[in-house]
Amino acid sequence: MRLSRHFLPVMKESPADAQIVSHKLMLRAGMIRQTAAGIYAWLPLGHRVLRKIEQIVREEQDRAGAIELLMPTMQSADLWRESGRYDAYGPEMLRIKDRHDREMLFGPTNEEMITAIFRDNARSYRDLPRILYHIQWKFRDEVRPRFGVMRGREFLMKDAYSFDLDIEGARHSYNRMFVAYLRTFRRMGLSAIPMQADTGPIGGDLSHEFIVLAPTGESEVFYHTNWEVERALDVDVDDVAALQGFVDGLTADYAATDEKRDPAREAAAGDSLKQSRGIEVGHIFYFGTKYSAAMGMTVQGPDGQPVTPQMGSYGIGVSRLMGAIIEASHDDAGIVWPDAVAPYTVGLINMRADDARCAAAADDLYAKLEAAGIETLYDDRDERGGAKFATMDLIGLPWQIVVGPKGLDKGVVELKRRATGEKVELSVEDAIARIAG
């Protein structure tokens, strides 16, 4: 994509009301614009990153055996009355009436709807186990939306729901998602720590939050320093015993949110205990028959008797992840995108758009990068070199290639790695090979 044809409204200064780094940089980099309190339009650059994050989430859900569907944002209030949560949920749930005076709501979560769908369509134990998921926009009427996409009122979520015949099967589904989440966040360049967590309004007996450490995080967290060492995640999720042993081994190291602190385990950790702040990017729950029983869901068991399925739910904040990645990966100049989620792989800078030789060389290099399948943002604008460098550093693409008169005299281009600042002069062919890696 040529920057001269792109829609990239970058800002030199941060708006006064932007409080945290990710909010400031997303606005400055032309990724989002606020349209109402806690509601944002996703501009082209931000939308590209959002789609890449979403695709990684989707691939790891599929890999874990989950099946994708899509549920609507609007839900009937009657479903929530069945579960008993309609009156209990609170003012965060936006309630409306349609023209026929039927009570509706913007879904803040989907336990009721997925339970109704499964209840009305699953008949036998042969329909279990199943994990169903969707990626959909949600709305929660936060009393004080803040921090940009980190705590907005409208946000993109991945929600998965498991249905199992017994507790053992439900725990296996839970463990599948536990590992899938660790793999998901690692692919995005994040180190997420699974922490024992409060179940909140979702309910249930077992819950983990996945926390990315950041000074701006809203959660106070406590963990063993062993969590600072990257763990191998090459376990067979279909092997029930091996997977349970793997999860037990991981969670043997203490990690908990403030609500679930364990003084005895903290004392045992001794000097290895750390206290920090973190950002919640995922939350998983096992809640047994809380919703299936309340909504009358049964299937015929192997012995012909009705069985109430065991359930779990598994959420990832897809849009929130973008803010978390920026909080974890930035410097004074701007964003530093991990390769897997960067909007483009390389930023190509023509230092002299008014120089016919530079323009021809940059155009040729752009064509070669595109032919090699390398996503490229080509700054072909007639701007000062300093402004072009500042824009590229701000938007944080993993690589920068600079084409200028001095380099052309030597038959080289300058290649810069954004994360390290390392610069090397290479031939065009070698630069492309280095990026393609």
Curated annotation (Swiss-Prot):
UniProt entry keywords in alphabetical sequence: Aminoacyl-tRNA synthetase, ATP-binding, Cytoplasm, Ligase, Nucleotide-binding, Protein biosynthesis
EC number: 6.1.1.15
Localization terms from the record: Cytoplasm
Family matches, as HAMAP family: Pro_tRNA_synth_type2
GO MF annotations in UniProt: ATP binding; proline-tRNA ligase activity
Similarity annotation: Belongs to the class-II aminoacyl-tRNA synthetase family. ProS type 2 subfamily.
InterPro entries named among the record's database cross-references: aa-tRNA-synt_IIb (IPR002314), aa-tRNA-synth_II (IPR006195), aa-tRNA-synth_II/BPL/LPL (IPR045864), Anticodon-bd (IPR004154), Anticodon-bd_dom_sf (IPR036621), Pro-tRNA-ligase_IIa (IPR002316), Pro-tRNA-synth_IIa_bac-type (IPR004500), Pro-tRNA_synthetase (IPR050062)
Protein name: Proline--tRNA ligase
Signal peptide, first to last residue: none
Entry superkingdom: Bacteria
Assembly, per entry: Homodimer.
Enzyme class: ligase
PANTHER family for the chain: MITOCHONDRIAL RIBOSOME PROTEIN L39/PROLYL-TRNA LIGASE FAMILY MEMBER, PROLINE--TRNA LIGASE
Reaction catalyzed: tRNA(Pro) + L-proline + ATP = L-prolyl-tRNA(Pro) + AMP + diphosphate
Functional note: Catalyzes the attachment of proline to tRNA(Pro) in a two-step reaction: proline is first activated by ATP to form Pro-AMP and then transferred to the acceptor end of tRNA(Pro).
A Pfam entry, by short name: HGTP_anticodon
GO cellular component: cytosol
GO BP term, example: prolyl-tRNA aminoacylation
Record's keyword annotation contains ATP-binding: yes
